[in-house]
Structures are given as structure tokens and as C-alpha cells.
Amino acid sequence: MSAKKLFIQTLGCAMNVRDSEHMIAELTQKENYALTEDIKEADLILINTCSVREKPVHKLFSEVGGFEKVKKEGAKIGVCGCTASHLGNEIFKRAPYVDFVLGARNISKITQAIKTPKFMGVDIDYDESEFAFADFRNSIYKSYINISIGCDKHCTYCIVPHTRGDEISIPFNIIYKEAQKAVEKGAKEIFLLGQNVNNYGKRFRNEHKKMDFSDLLEELSTIEDLERIRFTSPHPLHMDDKFLEVFANNPKVCKSMHMPLQSGSSEILKAMKRGYTKEWYLNRALKLRELCPNVSISTDIIVAFPGESEKDFEETMDVLEKVRFEQIFSFKYSKRPLTKAATMPNQIDEETASRRLSTLQNRHSEILDEIVKKQENKTFKVLFEELRAGNSIAGRTDNNFLVQVEGSEELLGQFKEVKITNAKRMVLYGEIV
């Protein structure tokens, strides 16, 4: 019997990418589906959604409306992920042609969902931490691995605890076996995923070996033929000295750290319920620079959070100047349902929010120009992962710079030393040496 066709669109973060891989694995290996990039020939159309900001939620309904217009007769549409979790039955009301809704904490139910009319699985307390998913990966050379699900932080602006539930760690033996299996199949790099990865080990479903995130990194680095370990996202509150020292000293841990700042104002951080101050954040970031001079630090910043004054915004700019981030993901505050910040007084007007975002981004562009210029004539070890137009190939350095050289398919999955000849903001161009 010929395979049915599956089309999947993934919005949002790396955790959504891994969730999509899990659903693809379940459907291709258990339900006789094969992936297609042509939505018109698909028997099943999935969209895996994000709800961190308002814009992706609006995008969901425009996308599924488009799916309905082009899908073939009898094809099913499923809405999955975080927006599915928080909108639930509202999706059926607004888009009655959707066949099932599957929340971010319920993706193991995908084979049940496709067989049940108007199936809705949105239980954020459902525990998938020990579910044995079938195996599928978009990349041979890099493997995403979940180490926890959910989040306990309840930051006042964030909807994630309402869509992914409380935090629970995945047992070490499951993580280790998954990493080992990925390496045996050709992975050179593993990418550990969780809302707060460095809070790992605080709570498991059952009794398991006591282990924190630093211990996990050390244990995984013993896997033979594993070259690199990356992770996202750590929480600044849990960046103790042990963690920073393991990060700096373990040669398999990539020297790229995502440190979500959100705001440089201690008052705004308190209102956000982030659990740390500006001083704590700077202490950790600057200690990291001291321990690991070649580290690249990226961050998330929200401008115009309710009550943010010009002085508060200047505190954020001050952290930008002191840390000099290699990369920032910056946004205007987006009011999200179910969050405390949505009903806070002193919401900031659009004009002020746009001005602050432009000021932040423009200054960071200047800093980034200075940073990338210093990379010229340096030599980096690069893992090549992606073919590009014009007989070019791209990969990443240990500290996460994107590098492009002339090259072809045989370089995929290989490490090569590359000398940088021309450094741009988004790409470092170089030559293999």
C-alpha cells in the first residue's frame, strides 16, 4: 500500500522543531505516512504553532485558511503546539474545517488524533517526560534532544506555563540513550532543549538519579565520537559558579551562551518576576566573559513592558554597552492572555515602544559591526551543515558564528578549519585552510 502524504509547517522555537520531529516520526513509522513539501498532494496537513507573541497567533488563522483553500478533497488539517494549548475549542469555532487540535504537551497523542473526529488534546498536565517517541531528525549531523518539558517560572509576561505546563525533567538514561543513538547515526552535535535547561534535575516523574545540569553536560560529553554540545535556554537565575566553570572548561560544550536579559532595570525585572537583578545578571555575564574569553553571548530583550520609564530603558541600554552581546532577539512587549502583565497599569504606547526598539536595535547593530570586524583573519573550526546557492556551503563555529565558504556536498557533516576573509553582520565569509 502506498504511503499517505504528510505536510507539516513549524512556527516558533527549537522546541517546536523537535516536537514536529516527534510527530513526523510517529506518523511515518507507525501510520504509513511520507513527508511531502507539496501541500496540494497531502493527506494530512499539520501546523505546529507558537503563542509567545500575538503575531504568530494571528498567523495561525491566516495559514489554516490558506490550507483549506488548497487542500485536496478528504485531506485533514491539524493544529498543534502552544496556540492549540491555549485556544483549544476556540480554534474549532474560528476555523470549523480544522479536524483536530493537539497541544504542546500532548504530541504523543498524534496517532490517536488523526483517527478521532474533532479530537482535542490540550491537557497541560499530561506527562510525556518518559514517552518513547519513534525517531526522526531533520539533520543527520545535529540532533535536538529535549531534557525537560514545561516551565515553573511564571514570568508575568509569558504564556508558556499556560501552554506547556509545569516543568518536569526527562530522566538521564533516556537523554543519554537518545544522544548515543543520534551519534551512532552520524550526529556530530547534540542540542539540548528546555525552557530552563540549567534548572534540570529539580523534579522528575519518578525516582531517578540525582543530577543537575552541569552533571548532565559532563556525563553526555563522555559519549565517544560526540564532538559538540549546545543547549537553550538557560535561566540567569541558575547560572551558579559550577555551571559557568563546566561551560568554560568542558571542550565539548560549545562556547555560545544564550542569557535572556528581558530588561536591564531591576524594578522591571521584579515586575516581570524574573528572580534576579541587573547586578546579578551583569555579574554572571562578565564572569562568563572572564572565564571564557571567546564566548558569544546572545540574549532576549523586551522593550516597553508596562511601567517601563525612560530611566528603566536606559538601564537596558547600559547592560547592552557593558555585555556587548553578539546577538539580540528584541521585541516590543506583546500583551498575552492569561498573564499578569496583560492587566498591569501603565501600558506603554506604540510610538514610545517603537522608538525604544529602534534605539536598541540600531545601537546593537553598531556593536555587532565592531564585533564581526574583529573576526577577520581569524581561523575557526566549522561544522558544515547546509548547502547554499552559488556552489557555497555554510556551517557554524564553536561560538555560533555562521560561516560560508565555496564548497560542495562532500563537505556536509565535516569539520574544517576556515580563515575569515570578509566579515558581515549575518555571515562570515572565508576560505578552507
From Swiss-Prot:
Binds 2 [4Fe-4S] clusters. One cluster is coordinated with 3 cysteines and an exchangeable S-adenosyl-L-methionine. Residues 137-370 form the Radical SAM core domain. It is found in: Cytoplasm. It catalyses: N(6)-dimethylallyladenosine(37) in tRNA + (sulfur carrier)-SH + AH2 + 2 S-adenosyl-L-methionine = 2-methylsulfanyl-N(6)-dimethylallyladenosine(37) in tRNA + (sulfur carrier)-H + 5'-deoxyadenosine + L-methionine + A + S-adenosyl-L-homocysteine + 2 H(+). Its cofactor is [4Fe-4S] cluster. Keywords: 4Fe-4S, Cytoplasm, Iron, Iron-sulfur, Metal-binding, S-adenosyl-L-methionine, Transferase, tRNA processing. [4Fe-4S] cluster 2 binds at residues 151, 155, 158. GO terms for molecular function: 4 iron, 4 sulfur cluster binding; metal ion binding; N6-isopentenyladenosine methylthiotransferase activity. Catalyzes the methylthiolation of N6-(dimethylallyl)adenosine (i(6)A), leading to the formation of 2-methylthio-N6-(dimethylallyl)adenosine (ms(2)i(6)A) at position 37 in tRNAs that read codons beginning with uridine. Belongs to the methylthiotransferase family. MiaB subfamily. HAMAP family: tRNA_metthiotr_MiaB. This is tRNA-2-methylthio-N(6)-dimethylallyladenosine synthase. It comes from Campylobacter jejuni (strain RM1221). The gene is miaB.
